[in-house]
Amino acid sequence: MGNKINPNGFRLGVTKGWNSRWYAGKKQYASLLKEDEQIRQLINKKLAAAGIARIEIERAGQQVNVIISAAKPGVVIGKGGESIKELRGDIERLVSAGTVAVNVAEIPNPNISAPLVALRIAEQIERRFAFRRAMKQAAQRVMESGARGVKVILSGRLGGAEQARTEKVLEGRVPLHTLRADIDYGTALARTTYGILGIKVLVFNGEVIGGKTETFARPQRRDRDERRPEGGDRPARRRPTARRRTGGE
């Protein structure tokens, strides 16, 4: 089940939170859900160069709070705050009622953010990079940035082949069935001349214990000299003596 289900949905309420946090009745629920989807589409289209990793929407009464997690917050804010003011006006035209507040959060380490890694691979494939090279370089970059494991899945007409297939790159370990595992999940689409390729990235950052993500170092293997007891070399083994078997009368 861990290989099929969305890793974020599988861990909701355990180690992951909701991207939309509000409550509405039966009559308003559908319209507010549609507004959230329109807001996300607008932000992803308007701020594609900012490296958007996550968009959270909170509603309380007539107040709508949009939190944008981006690798380049300067692109979201713009010169003198012009871009964020324009974005706030566009969102207010989509929202049925209430005032809109837009906040920007910077991602401290974009190299271990799964959505950003997937977007980077998609950009390289669209610029005609070799897909295997792009996948391996992305996985190595994630591991060098301190992640415990990474899994990259690429599917579609790879290399312009007639038949679609799937290729995977795995570095470290990615425990999909462990609910306390802090796994970041992201997807992206690479639009090429021979079709659309789907990219999935899963990054394992450690295990969440007591509300904190803890990483455990792998035990290092000791050398042979360190494993020997103090006081000399290893005692020689006695070879078993061969017994001569004689037949009885």
Swiss-Prot record:
Chain ranges passing through the membrane: none
GO molecular function: mRNA binding; rRNA binding; structural constituent of ribosome
Skewed-composition ranges (Basic residues): 236-249
Gene Ontology biological-process annotations: translation
Residue stretches of biased makeup (Basic and acidic residues): 220-235
Source domain of life: Bacteria
Keyword tags: Ribonucleoprotein, Ribosomal protein, RNA-binding, rRNA-binding
InterPro entries given in the database record: KH_dom-like_a/b (IPR015946), KH_dom_type_2 (IPR004044), KH_sf_prok-type (IPR009019), Ribosomal_S3_C_sf (IPR036419), Ribosomal_uS3_bac-typ (IPR005704), Ribosomal_uS3_C (IPR001351), Ribosomal_uS3_CS (IPR018280)
Domain KH type-2 stretches: 39-108
GO cellular component terms attached to this protein's record: cytosolic small ribosomal subunit
Classification via Pfam families: KH_2, Ribosomal_S3_C
PANTHER family: 30S/40S RIBOSOMAL PROTEIN S3, SMALL RIBOSOMAL SUBUNIT PROTEIN US3C
Subunit composition and interactions: Part of the 30S ribosomal subunit. Forms a tight complex with proteins S10 and S14.
The protein's name: Small ribosomal subunit protein uS3
Source organism per UniProt: Deinococcus radiodurans (strain ATCC 13939 / DSM 20539 / JCM 16871 / CCUG 27074 / LMG 4051 / NBRC 15346 / NCIMB 9279 / VKM B-1422 / R1)
